[in-house]
């Protein structure tokens, strides 16, 4: 495998140190696995951090029931290939109520099937540290997130109740009832992630690569018709377009972009010319002003 460029080598070393610090400091950590490119890089780093031993904590996937079919297939194949321990949790109460991203709306769907589901899973299994792949460059509320981000007993985030983190002086100590979200990729950018994927040959979901896919125009975004549950509006017909996804979530809430980038190298070239956020395709970010910060205060990823 080629030698990493110096900037990626430093980012890798920092992330591995954070993962080892987490394993040493907490009783029951868990790695949040959302199946996207950041989760893939995070999992690769975790395997490196503890090699030749297995990853010393399980993976947790909060399944809303509305992920792309290719994402679920990729998740299951990855777990089998690497021999990982995966916990899949769904908010059964929300499912019984029929909460979904179409009829219920993105805000309610996200709160019930993602935020409440995550809190349920953390409480049920007693996890005191949840390791996630969020990065500070993604969104302004994440820009002020600490590497070790304190959550109260209700898993809520208060930006005023966070500790200083000077240089690499992390503070993983918590009070009884508290937990933390740990973000080893805090200082990475989207371009860093893709360069690392290329350098380390990390597999990613094929949806990241351009291909002909059936899409409809919804809320200013190109929404892929992934299965028969997406109702078509009167006069609406899916069209085949060459698109890819910069970010992946529930398929009715994830907008595609027109693209010809069919390889990781193509994506890197595209990223170098891009002047827009990767989260432009996430419909949940536009629910209301400061919606991401409000979601995080409620316990979102």
Swiss-Prot record:
PANTHER family: SULFATE ADENYLYLTRANSFERASE SUBUNIT 2. Residues 278-301 are annotated as: Disordered. Proposed to provide activated sulfate for transfer to nod factor. Its EC number is 2.7.7.4. It comes from Azospirillum brasilense. It is an enzyme of class 2 (transferase). This is Sulfate adenylyltransferase subunit 2. NCBIfam families: CysD, PRK05253.1, PRK12563.1. Pfam families: PAPS_reduct. It comes from the Bacteria. Keywords: ATP-binding, Nodulation, Nucleotide-binding, Nucleotidyltransferase, Plasmid, Transferase. GO terms for molecular function: ATP binding; sulfate adenylyltransferase (ATP) activity. Sulfate-activating enzymes, NodP and NodQ, may be physically associated. It catalyses: sulfate + ATP + H(+) = adenosine 5'-phosphosulfate + diphosphate. Belongs to the PAPS reductase family. CysD subfamily. One of its GO terms (biological process) is hydrogen sulfide biosynthetic process.
